[in-house]
């Protein structure tokens, strides 16, 4: 079985590229089915396994396939599928892609789950996102034995690393960085009005950090008004005035807000240049801070050219969250050591799994030989032959049949193959214990 991780992340590509490769969560199962069919069409034997992890900072395809030439086939087929599915020219995607086979794929999965490959070193949100990706693949019926085992081991390693190191102790989250960036423009958050667009985990986390500064008021604009109202109610319970808006209300109310934080799964921008220009006129060009945590982006990038708008993307926040790196270095080294050991364990498991078909074939062949000799012995006993002679003949027959294949291979081999067999056969037939004396 061959493993492969092919992807793109914040290390290899800017947000302008990453947003073109990101998958809409609503269509992820459909994409997984399409990927499997594409891999099947690439001359794969058996059913390929697949999982897609798509977040604001990375899009990764994890694959497993049972084929002697699977490594090259998996890379070519998966890259071709990704480029075609996201309607990108291969030449524009290739410079940003990484392709990790076998143990490199395992190591990468472990590092991602532990937060070692994140923009925020040690952050925990990625682990939940990986679990969601695995759940989606399982629901789609494309997870399979090998990837399921890989991710179960991945989650166990992440738990071990977080429990035995201080990997997340000194990290600064995206939410905290959003507050700090806003405070560069507005000294007191308590005097500002804040708009959150979206109501998912990221916005909920951001709201927690901003609400701690007791802003003047807060509004939640979300696709489903009920979810937005739930978040608004939880904010109101903290003595901060909050309300829920429909997305359709944004053009008429955008000018009311000083700080706007957005993180949705929309495939198209929610806030356009014209909408912001109109809002600035109504504000008489009072500054606005806009923080875009979405991939694909929720704000049209042209907005950044406006003089009175401070637009930040996830890549911009990356500069702030690098603080604390030196303090985390010892924990990172400890985590890497744990991961390296667990990679070896998983690869040993994979090698054992690869031997299962051979073991089953040998066991089935042994059973056929046993049954054949047993039937012959039973017939002789039915004829009244001497039981001692029958037992001796059955034992001799089993011995000859079990040794025939190995001796035949040795006698008809030469060169390096013969040398290898001479070293191997004694190990195969070595006794594991001395016979007991009776």
UniProtKB/Swiss-Prot annotation:
Gene3D superfamilies: Glutamyl-tRNA reductase, N-terminal domain, NAD(P)-binding Rossmann-like Domain. The active site is at residue 56. Pfam families: GlutR_dimer, GlutR_N, Shikimate_DH. It catalyses: (S)-4-amino-5-oxopentanoate + tRNA(Glu) + NADP(+) = L-glutamyl-tRNA(Glu) + NADPH + H(+). Keywords: NADP, Oxidoreductase, Porphyrin biosynthesis. One of its GO terms (molecular function) is glutamyl-tRNA reductase activity. The record marks 108 as: Important for activity. Substrate binds at residues 55-58, 118, 123-125, 129. It comes from the Bacteria. Its EC number is 1.2.1.70. Pathway: Porphyrin-containing compound metabolism; protoporphyrin-IX biosynthesis; 5-aminolevulinate from L-glutamyl-tRNA(Glu): step 1/2. NADP(+) binds at residues 198-203. One of its GO terms (biological process) is protoporphyrinogen IX biosynthetic process from glutamate. During catalysis, the active site Cys acts as a nucleophile attacking the alpha-carbonyl group of tRNA-bound glutamate with the formation of a thioester intermediate between enzyme and glutamate, and the concomitant release of tRNA(Glu). The thioester intermediate is finally reduced by direct hydride transfer from NADPH, to form the product GSA. NCBIfam families: hemA. Possesses an unusual extended V-shaped dimeric structure with each monomer consisting of three distinct domains arranged along a curved 'spinal' alpha-helix. The N-terminal catalytic domain specifically recognizes the glutamate moiety of the substrate. The second domain is the NADPH-binding domain, and the third C-terminal domain is responsible for dimerization. Belongs to the glutamyl-tRNA reductase family. Homodimer. Catalyzes the NADPH-dependent reduction of glutamyl-tRNA(Glu) to glutamate 1-semialdehyde (GSA). This is Glutamyl-tRNA reductase. The lineage of its organism: Bacteria, Pseudomonadati, Pseudomonadota, Betaproteobacteria, Burkholderiales. The gene is hemA.
